[in-house]
């Protein structure tokens, strides 16, 4: 797909890029090359290839879904100036 300077200028405007006039011809050639490569990729037969979301075949380890208290309450409350019944105790700010 061959792009001309007018199309490159329109793309630059849409992308909010300020491209100097003397660079338009070179960019038109580079973008045309990129689009030609994409067209080649579109021609590849992928009918026998399974769809994938990542190139790495990763699987997460499953664990039992159980509710716990986390075991951090004592360590977290140790940072509080004051605590009461397992909660932070803060000064009253509203009368």
Curated annotation (Swiss-Prot):
Molecular function terms, GO-annotated:
asparaginyl-tRNA synthase (glutamine-hydrolyzing) activity; ATP binding; glutaminyl-tRNA synthase (glutamine-hydrolyzing) activity
Q: What processes does the entry annotate via GO biological process terms?
A: glutaminyl-tRNAGln biosynthesis via transamidation; regulation of translational fidelity; translation
**What sections of the sequence does the record tag as coiled-coil?**
none
Keywords for this protein = ATP-binding, Ligase, Nucleotide-binding, Protein biosynthesis
> What reactions does this protein catalyze?
L-glutamyl-tRNA(Gln) + L-glutamine + ATP + H2O = L-glutaminyl-tRNA(Gln) + L-glutamate + ADP + phosphate + H(+); L-aspartyl-tRNA(Asn) + L-glutamine + ATP + H2O = L-asparaginyl-tRNA(Asn) + L-glutamate + ADP + phosphate + 2 H(+)
Could you tell me the EC number(s) of this protein?
A: 6.3.5.-
Q: What class of enzyme is it?
A: ligase
Query: What is its quaternary makeup?
Result: Heterotrimer of A, B and C subunits.
State its role: Allows the formation of correctly charged Asn-tRNA(Asn) or Gln-tRNA(Gln) through the transamidation of misacylated Asp-tRNA(Asn) or Glu-tRNA(Gln) in organisms which lack either or both of asparaginyl-tRNA or glutaminyl-tRNA synthetases. The reaction takes place in the presence of glutamine and ATP through an activated phospho-Asp-tRNA(Asn) or phospho-Glu-tRNA(Gln).
* Family membership noted in the UniProt record: Belongs to the GatC family.
User: What name is this protein filed under?
Assistant: Aspartyl/glutamyl-tRNA(Asn/Gln) amidotransferase subunit C
């Amino acid at each position: 797909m061959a792009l001309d300077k007018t199309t490159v200028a329109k793309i630059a405007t849409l992308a909010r890029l300020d491209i100097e006039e003397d660079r338009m011809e070179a960019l038109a050639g580079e973008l045309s090359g990129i689009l030609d490569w994409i067209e080649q990729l579109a021609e590849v037969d992928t009918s026998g290839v399974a769809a994938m979301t990542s190139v790495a075949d990763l699987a997460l380890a499953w664990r039992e879904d159980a509710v716990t208290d986390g075991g951090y309450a004592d360590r977290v409350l140790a940072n509080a100036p004051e605590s009461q019944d397992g909660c932070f105790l803060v000064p009253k700010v509203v009368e």
